[in-house]
């Protein structure tokens, strides 16, 4: 498991290798990342120290020579270092809409959906371990739809895949293949939701040697006695059972679902429409997790998964389900990005400026999520994994109302709970572990607290103790 320390100047580790054509731009990026991370919820004028810093930030985000891909590239290099030594990496990709409908004057944005909305599309790829520790943002595609060319269902089937938004899945798996070549001993699995159930996505991943794990959206034709995917899965044997804890989501209450798990080998036939020309049938494995007896009035959990990773036993079927559940991690990242970093409230004048800014916040949001999950997965490690000495000492003194901290730093799990306590976490037995929201709110309280601690612990010079010149003879 990755146990790399996040140094005091973490921004240097994540952005210090950015190749932006000028070392001054690189230094500005590192400084901006550090300042924005200290107050992720604040507007730019609030987060930056003075008018000069704000003006420099606007110049940076307005610079057409700085591509957002170059901003992210340095973080990807750091992420690959964290990935070394892992046998399996789950490259989870997902799409979210960034809504700027309240800023209609921003140039270069486009429609979000048929019913309205104005903003950009964000398609990210995050690296997770099978234990769901996020190790970095591997890819970030940001684009705005053309308002002159609405997405028409009538022409979608006949258009080439390169002209569809679903090409994002293929583009991302190609980027994963490039990273895979740098870690040849690691199995890379692209994990995605039902929107990625695109035949060309499966064939491209197979050609590149990247495994896939996706949720089926279409009842495709398959080779075999049943002829259809869903019927073939229903006819497969039950290999095991599982109880799955479902977190609260929207109006859905938290509950435990009792699932029966079926699994079998499958061969998907090529699509019958024009998009299937030149393709060949593809062999995959299917896993169906179904809740036969849900609570009254509750829709049953129903996951039909397709994967290129073999499923030959009950344990392997359960492992694929656990891997797919890692998708919740990228949804948490979206939440931190929108609610914690308040990216949809940012007011810059153009799409390109927003794209550069969002890339910086994408890494800041990852760091918050990383700290949260690290405390859950490695609770006994020292809190210096994410806090410098002044931070944990200030935190300890504040929580315990004492003037001096102990010599030994507390465990990471305890420190995280204290930080969350600053953000409103009560810590009752029924509350479970702190979430990302109370954690980022707590970090915001910790920053000024640490600054005051640094000031107060400095040696104090009184009038009588200050050095002075002798005015008489020695």
Model-derived regions: residue spans:
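Single, function-defining residue in the core of a domain
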Residues: 1-106, 114-121, 126-474
């Amino acid at each position: 498991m990755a146990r790399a320390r996040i140094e005091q100047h973490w921004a240097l580790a994540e952005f210090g290798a950015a190749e932006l054509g000028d070392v001054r731009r690189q230094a500005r990026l590192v400084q901006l990342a550090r300042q924005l991370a200290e107050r992720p919820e604040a507007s730019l004028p609030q987060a930056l120290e003075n008018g000069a810093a704000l003006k420099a930030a606007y110049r940076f985000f307005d610079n057409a020579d700085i591509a957002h891909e170059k901003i992210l590239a340095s973080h990807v290099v750091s992420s690959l270092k964290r990935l070394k030594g892992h046998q399996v990496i789950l490259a989870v990709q997902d799409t979210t809409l960034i809504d700027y409908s309240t800023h209609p004057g921003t140039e270069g944005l486009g429609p979000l959906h048929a019913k309205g909305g104005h903003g950009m599309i964000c398609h990210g790829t995050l690296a997770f371990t099978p234990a769901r520790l996020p190790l970095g943002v591997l890819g970030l595609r940001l684009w705005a739809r053309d308002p002159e060319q609405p997405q028409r269902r009538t022409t979608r089937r006949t258009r080439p895949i390169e002209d569809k938004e679903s090409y994002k899945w293929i583009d991302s798996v190609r980027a994963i293949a490039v990273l895979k070549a740098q870690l040849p001993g690691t199995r890379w699995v692209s994990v995605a939701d039902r929107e990625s159930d695109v035949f060309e996505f499966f064939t491209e991943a197979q050609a590149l040697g990247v495994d896939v794990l996706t949720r089926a959206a279409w009842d495709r034709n398959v080779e075999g006695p049943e002829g259809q995917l869903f019927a073939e899965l229903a006819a497969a044997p039950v290999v095991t059972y599982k109880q799955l804890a479902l977190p609260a989501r929207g109006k859905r209450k938290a509950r435990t679902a009792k699932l029966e798990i079926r699994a079998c080998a499958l061969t998907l036939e090529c699509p019958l429409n024009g998009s299937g020309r030149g393709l060949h049938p593809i062999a995959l494995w299917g896993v169906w997790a179904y809740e036969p007896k849900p609570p009254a009035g509750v829709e049953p959990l129903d996951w039909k998964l397709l994967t290129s990773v073999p499923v030959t036993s009950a344990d392997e079927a359960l492992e694929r389900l656990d891997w797919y559940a890692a998708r919740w991690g990228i949804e948490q990242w979206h939440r931190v990005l929108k609610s914690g970093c308040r990216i949809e409230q940012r007011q810059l004048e153009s799409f390109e400026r927003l794209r550069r800014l969002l890339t910086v916040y994408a890494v800041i949001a990852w760091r918050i999520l990383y700290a949260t999950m690290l405390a859950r997965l490695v609770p006994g490690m020292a809190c210096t994994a994410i806090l410098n000495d002044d931070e944990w000492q200030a935190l300890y003194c504040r929580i315990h109302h004492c003037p001096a901290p102990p010599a030994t730093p507390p465990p990471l799990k305890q420190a995280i709970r204290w930080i969350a306590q600053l953000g409103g976490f009560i810590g009752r037995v029924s509350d479970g572990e702190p979430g990302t929201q109370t954690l980022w709110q707590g970090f915001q309280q910790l920053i000024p607290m640490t600054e005051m601690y640094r000031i107060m612990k400095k040696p104090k010079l009184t009038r009588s103790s200050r050095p002075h010149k002798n005015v008489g003879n020695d």
